[in-house]
């Protein structure tokens, strides 16, 4: 075999490994300054349905097959400044392994103020659907998949006291989700209002009753409609997970990963409601 043939064969043998090397990113998301692992951080291609969530130790693995070097790779987490990379840069930096450092976020004073002199009332808003005659299943259990409902409050300041999720059927031994509260802009979900992450864990036995999340420790005040959503941050495994549902109960909002565009599904509402304290 001459030198030219030998070189060609070596290149052909190396090609599959080089291609595989560039198709997957691996790394660890840590806190800048402390090196502490950041669990359940969001990693994804901005504006596209390609993403994942870091595990309990901050490790992540993301398939980037078919993505452009000009795409934006975004790392984000509640309580931290988001970090963007051009995918071409990240492809080189994280093809083997890398540490991604996120900086803690500083929050200003809340913009929504509730007048203590005004008379207040407690309201249940959203879809407080207890009947399981109609259900809506979760067809996508991708890490980072998010689903929820828009809560209307008629443009009066309100304090969120409790979130309730009504589950029609759950065959998973344990479900672990992250609760998100998004403001709205032009009738679409906007910024996440939470300053610290809120996780919800329950067993299939506990799912037979409404899942209630006490929001009083978080002091979340809203001025306008807001989206309540739940996000898959741990693998669910095999099984079924259905929420109660009802016709003409607003739309289901969902996105496949944290960086994907929000989409809506028809006039079928899912059993997510909120208890709020609002000015009369």
Show where each model-derived region lies.
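Structural motif
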Residues: 23-38
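A short, solvent-exposed loop/turn motif at the edges and junctions
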Residues: 72-87
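Short, acidic Ser/Thr/Gly-rich low-complexity loop/linker segments typical of extracellular
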Residues: 49-59
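Short strand-edge motifs at loop-to-beta-strand transitions and within beta-strands
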Residues: 60-62, 96-98, 209-213
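Hydrophobic beta-strand segments
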Residues: 35, 41-45, 58, 73, ...
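Beta-sheet-rich sandwich/jelly-roll-like modules and their strand-loop junctions
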Residues: 107-184, 225, 231-280
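Extracellular beta-sheet/turn segments enriched in Thr/Pro/Gly and aliphatic residues
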Residues: 90-116
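Short Pro-Gly-centered beta-turn/loop motif in secreted/extracellular proteins
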Residues: 61-71, 218-223
């Amino acid at each position: 075999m001459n030198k030219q043939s030998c070189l060609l064969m070596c290149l052909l043998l190396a090609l599959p490994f080089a291609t595989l090397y560039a198709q997957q990113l691996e790394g660890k998301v840590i806190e800048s300054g402390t090196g502490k692992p950041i669990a359940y951080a969001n990693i994804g291609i901005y504006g596209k349905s390609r993403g994942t969530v870091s595990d309990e130790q901050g490790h992540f693995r993301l398939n980037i097959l078919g993505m452009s070097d000009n795409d934006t790779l975004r790392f984000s987490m509640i309580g931290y400044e988001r970090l963007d990379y051009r995918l071409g840069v990240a492809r080189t930096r994280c093809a083997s392994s890398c540490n991604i450092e996120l900086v803690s976020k500083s929050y200003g004073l809340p913009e929504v103020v509730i007048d203590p002199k005004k008379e207040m009332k407690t309201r249940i808003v959203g879809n407080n659907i207890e009947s399981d005659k109609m259900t809506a299943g979760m067809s996508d259990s991708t890490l980072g998949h998010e689903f929820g409902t828009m809560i209307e409050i008629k443009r009066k300041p309100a304090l969120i006291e409790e979130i309730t999720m009504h589950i029609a059927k759950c065959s998973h031994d344990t479900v672990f989700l992250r609760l998100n509260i998004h403001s709205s802009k032009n009738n679409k979900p906007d910024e996440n209002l939470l300053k610290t992450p809120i996780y919800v864990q329950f067993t299939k036995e506990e799912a037979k009753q409404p899942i209630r999340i006490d929001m009083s420790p978080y002091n979340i005040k809203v001025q306008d409609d807001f989206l309540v959503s739940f996000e898959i941050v741990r693998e669910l495994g095999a099984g079924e997970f259905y929420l109660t549902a009802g016709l003409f109960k607003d739309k289901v909002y969902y996105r496949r990963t944290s960086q994907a565009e929000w989409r809506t599904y028809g006039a079928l509402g899912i059993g997510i409601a909120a208890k709020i304290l609002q000015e009369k």
